[in-house]
């Protein structure tokens, strides 16, 4: 409530005093003779700085969200839960056009190695950016087995940060002729969260012709209803808005 970026002029369930009331803590007031519930000023500093730190002593000097750029485009990565030894990886690309494909190849025993999973056609224009939650358990298990793995996708992953480095919201997306569409199996992909780099080191990658995009289903399962939104939606880095 003391922050310069919080609006205090609000009415809450605690009364007319705005958010200031949320800085109070409840306690049993024995001095009243009835041990009634009362309120007092809460602690000014964190009681457990391993959980909540201060501005003067932050967990990270730069925060947990970083921008990655390179010849694949622009993406963001959450590194709060990624150990330093996993923040830099250079490994061959394996291409997936659906998150289920990764699980199938894992079950078939084809992913017991270092690789960068490149998951395409998951952007706002392609399919509305669904949550790619199925990727995390598989990649996390492979990392636990000692393999260097990472994710690059034009899709999204919401929620808490994972332990696997994941370059998400890559723009431009594959359906918008983004560079991710030109990535081929085995291309050496570098993801460097420390330096903010996302780069395909394959020789001649930038000059590669853009491959054709296969026709995607446009009717059935309500697709007709949302066709206008798919056509007009903006890029992920611009908010994926239709306005």
Regions found by a protein language model. Give the residues of each.
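Catalytic or ion-coupling anion/metal-binding cores of large enzyme and transporter domains
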Residues: 1-148, 152-173, 178-243
